Each structure stands twice: as structure tokens, then as C-alpha cells.
Design a protein with these regions (language model features):
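Conserved AMP-binding A3 loop
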Residues: 42-44, 170-197
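Conserved AMP-binding/adenylate-forming core of the ANL superfamily
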Residues: 9-13, 22, 30-61, 65-74, ...
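AMP-binding/adenylate-forming catalytic core of the ANL superfamily
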Residues: 77, 98, 115-117, 370, ...
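Conserved pre-ATP/AMP-binding loop-to-beta segment of ANL
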Residues: 14, 30, 156-176, 181, ...
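Conserved ATP/PPi-binding loop(s) of AMP-dependent carboxylate-activating enzymes
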Residues: 339-343, 354-386, 422-424
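Conserved AMP-binding/adenylation subdomain of ANL enzymes
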Residues: 193-211, 221-260, 274
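Gly/Ser/Thr-rich phosphate-binding loop
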Residues: 255-263, 272-333, 345
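ANL superfamily adenylate-forming
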Residues: 120-166, 176, 181, 274
Length: 517
């Protein structure tokens, strides 16, 4: 699909991410590429290690096959990921917290030829690979696994030939699976590479002068896009946190003079209430990026007031390669995910048929097209046909755009509630709750109601020391929402149900709220 678009209007588009890394090593070989704890690699060393491991994978027959990566954050995971690409194999990044049941579905569906894993998951992965008869399993990192920086001094190493083609599959990224079994999204090198350049056009970086902090897990599509690929494209330094700890993040931000901070909304919310936040020096930070879940407007305002740095919010999904829109620097609009990226088209269409195109200010489903859109789902022809219709990706997200072309996401189509015949988008209720001074986190959902069909309920986490009652919060909603949108019940809880990547788990949320009685 990328080939039918005029990509000459974009900053340099590499044929594949392997070419991108090779270019970075050629231009900035002595610059530090990766830092994780006391380990680091220059760009020249990075490429050597990728070449060394890629040659090993190629020798195992990985070309054209799927290679699963079940690893936590470390210096080894970027090397392994690029090595899979360099071996002309398709990378399958998998959440390392998945159970054996969840892993089985993905490994079987992907027909994994090689599984790369670390010692933290060895007890689960090794017997599973044996039972599934996976041809090859390689343990990396830690005290008992292979160290993938072993090739860093071997200047004679070269990438295996031939390199992958732009039309080859680069990744098979499985979607979260909060409803049903995860679906594998096929993304080609062309689709991946053009989206990197689309993001660069919208969010320009400074070549050889960026330091990006990666606290997100590198199996997640947002982390791969906004950390791993962003750093390699601009030849910046990627500082990797093995796991997220707010005090460590704040320390690294100052010590490493971080310039770019991609994170999910829960991180920004948590940092604002951390005891060390007010004393942290944010002078090096140029931009923070938010994605993967809605960012409360109140969080955006508080962050910018406290740090002097904007949080730029974008919109996308795994199927979209993954980014479709982003707020531009200097053009912040609270609550908006910005205008489209170059070479990207978004339309709002009616929810019922998806065929009637709506205008500015009208709410409907977002559909998208562009050179970054997925090829389809693996082994899911029916779901592919439902998602890709008439050249458009139907995102399942509800939103609108204004006269300036700025998009606002209202909710997921499947999360919309119908209360007495009226459409209610839980995210709007969330935003009103977040505007209360005592609220730290909030999540609303529709639940079955014998009279109205559905009614709204919500969980709320209060700030430390806050004293608001559920009745106070309902009164606040009554002052700011139409009557049918006001939660019938609000429950004060210690934490919201979340998925393993930190998003509010909407499926569990609905189930728990419905069970409250």
C-alpha cells in the first residue's frame, strides 16, 4: 500500500528499519546509541551486534519466518529486534507477563520458528516451547542468557545479504486482546518506515542531539515507534529503563539530560503526585509524548504549568502502523490529538453503516487511509474484511474534528453506552470527574440497567489526603453533564483495573462495575 503514495514529500524514507540503523552507524558510528544501567553501545557497536545475531538467526532458517520476542526491557532487546529484521524474518513482540495459555495462542497462530526469551520468563517459556515443538529457542540477557553485545568489538562483521525488501513483513504485532483472542497485525517494512518519516515530518527532531527515555515496555507498539525507531532515525541516545519506577525516571531525566519523554497517561498522572517531582530539573526536556490511551486534559494543563514542557498527544492503533495524528509543537489544543500526519486521511462516518461522511463538529466513527495502514490480520480473513473496507481502515474509535482539522477522540465504539436511547461516551464522564480537585484517576462505563437499558457507573481514585465522597462527585457531574450522562453510582477505590501495559482494562471495568449491585 505504501508504494501507491508519493513519499517524496516526507523526510528521508528508508527502505527498511535495517537500512535506517545502518545509516545511523555510518553517519554517527561513535555516538552512544543505547544505555541501560551500566551497559551501553555506540551506533557502530549496535550495528555489529545486530549483524552478529542476525547471521546466527539466518543460519537457523529464520528468513521469511516468524521470530517471537518474549523479553523485558534491557540492552539486548533492541539488538534482538533489529537482528530479527536484519535476518529478513518477521518480528513477533510478545508481552512477557502473558500466561502459558496466552503465549500458546500467539506462538501457534504465528507458527514461530524461533523464540527469543529472557531468564525472567524461562520457567514458563522453555517447557512451552518444548511442548509446542518450536524449532529453536534462545535465552538472552541476565545471568543465564546470551549477552547480545558479544559482537561489539568485531569490526569485520557485516549484515547478512540480501537485506529484507520494503515489501517484506517486518512485524506481526498482536493486539491487546481485552476482548476475545489477540489478532496478529501484519506490518511491512514499507508501512513501518513511512510512518517513521511521517512522524518526523510532524514532530521534527534534532539529528545527533536527542536523548530519549524509554520507560515503556519495548514489546509495545508505542514504545517501538516513539523510542526504538525515533532514536535510531535521529541518531539519538536511547536510555532504557528495565522497569518503570517514578523515582528512577526522575533521576535519569536529570542525570541523562533527557530531551524527549514518551509515556502513557498513567505515568504523567503518577509523576505529578510524586514527592520528588517539584524539585526535579526539567530544563533539558523539550517534549513529552502521550499515546496508547486518552490523556486527561487536567493532566496536560498541570504538567505544562509545572515543567514548562508540553505533552503532545497523538492517535493511532497497531493496525495504523501505528500513528495517524499528532498535536504539533507550538500548536497545542487541550483535549485534541491533533491534525493528521502527512499522507494520511481521516474521515468521520456514521456509526450505523460507516458510509455517510460527516462534517466538522459531527460525532461518528473514524476511518483512515494512508501508506502506513496494515496489510491485514494474520489468519483472520473475516476480521480483515471488516476492518479494511473500500480502501479505508475502520478504527472502531468515535471522534470528531473541528474547522481547523484537529481531531478529538470521544471513545471506543464498543465502549459507547446507550442510556434511555441516548448515546453516552464514558470518556466524557471521565473528563468531568478528572476536573474535580480531589480526583486522581477516574473511569466510567455503561452497565446493564433494567429500566434505561444501560446506566453509567464509575470508579474513582482520590488524591492522597482528599476527602470528597461519592455523593460529592455525583453532584459535580450533575453540574457539568446532562442528566442521562450522570453516573448513577460512583465507587471510591484504591486503583483502577488495568491491562499489563497500563491501560484501563475496559472489559474488567464493565464487569466489576456491573457486579457492584
Amino acid at each position: 500500500m505504501a508504494g501507491s503514495w508519493d513519499t517524496s514529500v516526507l523526510p528521508r524514507v528508508h527502505p527498511t528499519v535495517v537500512h535506517m540503523l545502518a545509516d545511523a552507524a555510518a553517519r554517527s558510528g561513535g555516538a552512544t546509541a543505547l544505555v541501560c544501567g551500566d551497559r551501553q553501545l555506540s551506533y557502530a557497536q549496535y550495528l555489529r551486534c545486530v549483524a552478529g545475531f542476525a547471521r546466527e538467526l539466518a543460519g537457523l532458517g529464520a528468513r521469511g519466518a516468524r521470530v517471537a520476542l518474549i523479553c523485558g526491557n534491557s540492552l539486548d532487546i533492541p539488538v534482538a529486534t533489529f537482528a530479527v529484521h536484519a535476518a529478513a524474518a518477521q518480528a513477533v513482540p510478545i508481552n512477557p507477563t502473558y500466561t502459558a495459555r496466552e503465549l500458546t495462542h500467539i506462538l501457534v497462530d504465528a507458527e514461530a520458528h524461533v523464540v527469543i526469551y529472557d531468564e525472567d520468563v524461562a520457567a514458563t517459556v522453555e517447557p512451552l516451547c518444548a511442548s509446542l515443538k518450536v524449532p529453536h529457542a534462545i535465552r538472552i540477557g541476565g545471568k543465564t542468557g546470551r549477552s547480545l553485545d558479544a559482537w561489539k568489538q568485531d569490526a569485520a562483521l557485516a549484515l547478512p545479504e540480501p537485506l529484507p525488501a520494503a515489501s517484506d513483513f517486518a512485524t506481526l504485532q498482536y493486539t491487546g486482546g481485552t476482548t476475545g483472542l489477540p489478532k496478529g497485525v501484519n506490518i511491512t517494512h514499507a508501512q513501518m518506515s513511512v510512518n517513521i518519516s511521517q512522524r518526523e515530518a510532524a514532530l521534527p527532531t534534532r539529528a545527533d542531539d536527542e536523548r530519549i527515555l524509554c520507560m515503556m515496555p519495548l514489546f509495545h507498539v508505542f514504545a517501538v515507534a516513539m523510542c526504538l525507531h525515533l532514536a535510531a532515525y535521529c541518531r539519538g541516545r536511547l536510555v532504557i529503563m528495565p522497569r518503570y519506577k517514578p523515582d528512577v525516571l526522575l533521576d535519569l531525566l536529570v542525570r541523562e539530560r533527557i530531551t524527549r519523554l514518551p509515556a502513557g497517561p498513567t505515568v504523567f498522572i503518577g509523576l505529578l503526585s510524586h514527592e520528588a517531582f517539584a524539585a526535579t530539573d526539567f530544563s533539558s526536556l523539550r517534549t513529552a509524548y502521550s499515546g496508547s490511551a486518552p490523556l486527561p486534559e487536567e493532566t496536560l494543563r498541570k504538567w505544562q504549568a509545572a515543567t514548562g514542557t508540553p505533552i503532545l498527544e497523538g492517535f493511532g492503533q497497531t493496525e495504523a502502523g501505528p500513528v495517524l495524528t499528532y498535536v504539533r509543537e507550538g500548536a497545542l489544543k487541550a483535549g485534541s490529538v491533533g491534525p493528521v500526519l502527512p499522507l494520511t486521511e481521516l474521515q468521520i462516518v456514521d456509526v450505523e453503516t460507516g458510509t455517510k461522511v460527516l462534517g466538522a463538529g459531527e460525532i461518528g466513527e473514524i476511518r483512515a487511509r494512508g501508506p502506513q495502514i496494515m496489510s491485514g490480520y494474520r489468519n483472520r480473513p473475516k476480521e480483515t474484511a471488516e476492518a479494511l473496507r473500500d480502501g479505508w481502515l475502520y478504527t472502531g474509535d468515535i471522534g470528531e474534528f473541528d474547522e481547523q482539522g484537529y481531531f478529538t477522540i470521544r471513545d471506543r465504539k464498543k465502549d459507547m453506552a446507550i442510556v434511555g436511547g441516548y448515546n453516552v461516551y464514558p470518556r466524557e464522564v471521565d473528563e468531568v470527574l478528572y476536573s474535580h480537585a480531589d480526583v486522581k484517576e477516574a473511569a466510567a462505563s455503561g452497565v446493564p440497567d433494567s429500566y434505561y437499558g444501560e446506566s453509567i457507573r464509575a470508579y474513582v481514585v482520590l488524591k492522597e489526603g482528599a476527602r470528597a465522597s461519592a455523593e460529592d462527585l455525583i453532584a459535580h457531574c450533575r453540574s457539568n453533564l446532562a442528566r442521562y450522562k450522570v453516573p448513577s453510582k460512583i465507587y471510591l477505590v484504591a486503583e483502577l483495573p488495568r491491562t499489563t501495559v497500563g491501560k484501563v482494562d475496559r472489559k474488567t471495568l464493565r464487569q466489576k462495575l456491573a457486579a457492584e449491585g
